[in-house]
Amino acid sequence: MNNTNDVLIQLMQILEDGTAGLTDAARRLDELSYTAQAGTLRELAQQRIAFHAEMKIVAEELGYNPPEAGTIVAKLHRGWMSIKDRLSGESPDGILEVAEQGEHHTVSVYEKMATQDIPERLRAAIVAQLAELRSAHETIKALLASR
């Protein structure tokens, strides 16, 4: 595999994982009657869906067709996050902390991918999404701080 395809695969997988994680966190917050926070996380999950669609278009423009399913490593990470979430007692703070950690990881991956040897079209999409991901990360930090 070449570097461009590897980058596309990693980005699309982390976006899929983010969608699943944020959706699950929103569901759990709804169950605890934290509907405003849940709504924010649902909006961020929708953002991930839009980012994934954009990356798919970029991939097709560049002649790539990355797979849609998450990796084993990502599935293990989600499993660990689920265990960690359960150990937190399903508290709103625990759920938001796990979401914040997921956002931190996503931003870190995007920052790394932006420095790779990739076509400028892909780099531009990464940089644009990274700015919004940083904002999303700050939003979740603010939700935690307001608790």
Predicted regions and their residues:
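Alpha-helical bundle segments that constitute or directly flank the non-heme di-iron/ferroxidase center
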Residues: 1-32, 93-117
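A structural signal for well-ordered alpha-helices, especially hydrophobic packing surfaces
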Residues: 19, 26, 52, 56-59, ...
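Alpha-helix boundary/capping detector
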Residues: 34, 41, 67, 74, ...
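Alpha-helical scaffold segments that form or flank carboxylate-/histidine-based iron centers
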Residues: 3-14, 34-53, 92-96, 121-135
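Carboxylate-rich helix-loop segments that flank metal/cofactor sites and access channels
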Residues: 57-107
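Conserved alpha-helical segments that form or flank metal/cofactor-binding pockets of metalloenzymes
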Residues: 38-73, 140-143, 147
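Preference for long, well-ordered alpha-helical segments
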Residues: 95, 99-147
